[in-house]
Structures are given as structure tokens and as C-alpha cells.
């Protein structure tokens, strides 16, 4: 009898804790690319919602501020840019009794890239955040960006893969690239990409044209949209602050391969992975003559020679660095190895990693990589090797 009494008390206590709580469920409450941006308000604290868990529970008194950012945008229900949902009973509702799952914007919410007061790359660059401006105030970040504020070629981005919600992400589709910080600069970059073959028509490598129908520069996302859950957050990855010029067959080859492997691993382990992705050194056809999209003597949008991706399990702190040679013409790519290749130790057996046209790729320990390339923050902590 005493045991039964104890169980009844426990059940009653648990039910009392649940009463009044509300939750956001992925994907039910954030369907479609027109889902609004969600800010979570607890007391005086307002934060951008991050879709880390399939179900995120909030205490009584929590409010959600829904926003449809971007010029001319607004909620389909009332045309307003923002509305507030309160936790009533066990679900979030507006004053008009609208539910979160029924709310959508007239068009996709637009993100912006905002400069912070922090510095990066050994204090050479500013750190930026991708996020949203709501009622004149910035909320971030969807991901972080370290770059010079003009062109992304030697900086890096920092993002997360949420393994517990990754399989519920909005399906990918291509969007137009843009520059939220300088729209004209975005248009200029569009033109540089579109007219590249004409610009480089006289540039040869190994006696052949540098660019042709198979080998050309594409807009390479450092933080990939395939790692992002919601529509508005995905669109933010098309900002040119997140784009580096990479050879198309390499970006679609091994760079895509290990990113996809990593996303699937996060899903399998239901883990959260932290990523740092960047480029370094400049691609050259002739020594000391770096190649840039503008094909100028001193290019402003340089093509990186290498692309790297550091992946760290946020719980175990195990990590690995993928390093890809962004040069489909290199005749002896192994001579460019920056560290000991430990792919086999990480249970990675990808024959295409040695295919130079798909991007010659090796795996490095973080310590080995960090001894050669000192671009990342010094406070990154990696304990062991992340195995696949």
C-alpha cells in the first residue's frame, strides 16, 4: 500500500510540473519554407530559437515573438511583421487563438549578417553573425562568420549540426545568392561568377584552359544549407559572406561527401556536432600570382587553395579535420599533405578522397592541423579522434 501511495504521489507531482508548460515540436510547428522566425522571451531575456531538439519545452510564462523579416513581409493571418504567442494551458496561442503550427509568413523571412565587437583570425578580421533584425534589434546567431567584410576566401564559418532534428529539416532547393550587408556587392559578385569563363579565356594550366564546362568556379557554401533545419535559416547560407569560390566538381565531390557523412553520423548518434569550415592559402596557376574571381593582379575575391572542415562532437569533444585541395589539375597532390592522413584510423574508407578532380582529401587530427594552420580560435577543445 505504501508503495502504491508513493507512486501516486510521484505521478501527481510530475503532472503538476507539466501543467502550464508549452513546447515547440519539430517539424510539426515549423512547416514549410515560410515558417516565421521564433524569438523566445522568458522574463526580460529574449533569444533566437534554435531547433536542437525534436521537442523543446518551456516553462509557464514563456512568450514567443514570431517575426516575418524582410521588406514587405508579414504574417499571412494579419499582415503584421510580428505577433506574440503566449503559453496558455499546454500550447502557444496568439490573442486571436492562433496556434504556432498554423502561423506562416507571406514569403521567406530574410536574414542579415551583423558585425560584432569580437575579432578573429589572430585579430585580423571581424567576427560576424548571421541572424535576424526584429523591431530594429539584431538576434543571432544562425552561424558565425569570420572574414574581412568584403570577400570570403581565407576566413571561416562556425555552425552546428543538430542530429536530433536533422532528418526533419526542410528539403533543399536552390536560392539566389545575395549580400545583406551590401546589395550592390552581391550583384557585382553575381556578375563575376556568370562571366568567369570569358574573363579567364586566356588563362592556361598544363596547356589547357583553366575553366571549361566541367571545371569552373561555383559559389561554395562554408556553412552548408544541408546542415540547417528551417527555411529562413537555410536561406541565410546563401549570403555571400558564407561563400568562397571553389571548383564546381570539387565542391560537389568530396566536400559534399564528407559533409553528408558527418550529417548522417550526427543523425545516427543523435548528437550535436560543431563545425568550423574555412579556406587558406591562394590557388595559383603561376607561382606568386593568386587567382581571384576578378582575375586582377591583386584579386579581391581570391580562390582558396585548400578548404578544411573541423568537426567536433559537443559532448565527447572528439574531433577530426578534413582538408581538401581545391585544385583539380594537380599532378602530385600527396606532396601537398599538411599532416598525417588518419582517415583509416577514423574508420573512413573513401577511394574518391584520392581523386584530384573531386578534391584530393585527407583527414587530420586537430592537434596536427593546428600546428600548421593557426586560423581557428584558441579556445577550441578537442580530446580524441571522432570516428565514423
Curated annotation (Swiss-Prot):
Saliva (at protein level). It is found in: Secreted. One of its GO terms (biological process) is digestive system process. GO terms for cellular component: extracellular region; mitochondrial inner membrane; nucleus. Pfam families: Endonuclease_NS. GO terms for molecular function: DNA nuclease activity; double-stranded DNA binding; double-stranded RNA binding; metal ion binding; RNA endonuclease activity; single-stranded DNA binding; single-stranded DNA endodeoxyribonuclease activity. InterPro entries: DNA/RNA_non-sp_Endonuclease_sf, Endo_G_ENPP1-like_dom, His-Me_finger_sf, Non-specific_endonuclease. Keywords: Endonuclease, Glycoprotein, Hydrolase, Nuclease, Secreted, Signal. Disruption phenotype: RNAi-mediated knockdown results in impaired blood digestion observed as an increase in nucleic acids, hematin and protein contents in the intestinal tract after blood meal. Glycans are attached at residue 260. It comes from the Eukaryota. Residues 1-18 form the signal peptide. Its main location: secreted. It is an enzyme of class 3 (hydrolase). Its cofactor is a divalent metal cation. SUPFAM superfamilies: His-Me finger endonucleases. Active from pH 5.5 to 11.0. Belongs to the DNA/RNA non-specific endonuclease family. This is Salivary protein Tsal2A. It comes from Glossina morsitans morsitans (Savannah tsetse fly).
Amino acid at each position: 500500500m505504501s508503495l502504491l501511495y508513493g507512486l501516486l504521489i510521484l505521478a501527481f507531482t510530475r503532472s503538476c510540473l507539466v501543467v502550464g508548460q508549452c513546447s515547440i515540436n519539430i517539424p510539426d510547428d515549423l512547416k514549410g519554407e515560410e515558417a516565421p522566425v521564433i524569438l523566445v522571451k522568458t522574463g526580460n531575456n529574449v533569444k533566437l530559437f534554435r531547433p536542437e531538439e525534436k521537442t523543446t519545452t518551456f516553462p509557464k510564462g514563456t512568450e514567443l515573438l514570431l517575426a516575418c523579416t524582410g521588406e514587405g513581409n508579414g504574417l499571412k493571418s494579419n499582415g503584421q511583421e510580428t505577433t506574440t504567442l503566449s503559453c496558455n494551458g499546454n500550447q502557444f496561442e496568439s490573442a486571436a487563438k492562433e496556434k504556432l503550427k498554423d502561423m506562416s509568413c507571406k514569403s521567406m523571412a530574410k536574414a542579415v549578417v551583423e558585425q560584432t565587437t569580437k575579432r578573429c583570425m589572430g585579430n585580423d578580421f571581424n567576427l560576424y553573425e548571421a541572424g535576424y533584425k526584429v523591431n530594429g534589434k539584431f538576434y543571432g546567431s544562425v552561424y558565425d562568420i569570420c572574414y574581412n567584410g568584403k570577400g570570403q576566401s581565407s576566413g571561416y564559418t562556425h555552425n552546428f549540426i543538430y542530429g536530433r532534428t536533422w532528418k526533419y529539416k526542410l528539403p533543399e532547393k536552390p536560392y539566389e545568392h545575395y549580400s545583406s550587408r551590401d546589395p550592390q556587392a552581391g550583384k557585382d559578385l553575381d556578375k563575376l561568377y556568370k562571366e568567369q569563363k570569358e574573363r579567364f579565356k586566356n588563362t592556361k594550366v598544363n596547356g589547357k584552359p583553366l575553366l571549361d564546362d566541367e571545371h569552373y568556379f561555383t559559389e561554395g557554401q562554408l556553412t552548408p544549407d544541408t546542415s540547417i533545419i528551417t527555411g529562413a535559416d537555410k536561406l541565410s547560407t546563401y549570403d555571400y559572406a558564407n561563400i568562397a569560390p571553389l571548383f564546381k566538381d570539387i565542391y560537389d565531390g568530396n566536400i559534399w561527401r564528407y559533409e553528408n557523412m558527418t550529417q548522417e553520423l550526427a543523425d545516427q548518434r543523435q548528437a550535436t556536432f560543431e563545425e568550423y569550415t574555412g579556406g587558406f592559402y591562394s590557388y595559383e596557376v603561376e607561382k606568386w600570382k593568386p587567382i581571384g574571381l576578378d582575375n586582377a593582379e591583386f584579386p579581391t575575391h581570391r580562390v582558396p587553395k585548400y578548404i578544411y572542415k573541423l568537426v567536433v562532437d559537443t559532448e565527447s569533444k572528439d574531433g577530426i579535420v578534413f582538408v581538401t585541395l581545391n585544385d583539380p589539375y594537380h599532378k602530385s597532390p600527396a606532396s601537398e599533405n599538411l599532416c598525417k592522413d588518419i582517415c583509416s584510423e577514423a574508420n573512413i574508407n573513401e577511394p574518391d578522397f584520392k581523386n584530384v578532380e573531386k578534391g584530393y582529401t585527407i583527414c587530420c587530427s586537430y592537434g596536427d592541423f593546428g600546428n600548421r594552420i593557426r586560423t581557428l580560435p584558441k579556445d577550441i577543445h578537442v580530446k580524441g579522434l571522432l570516428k565514423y
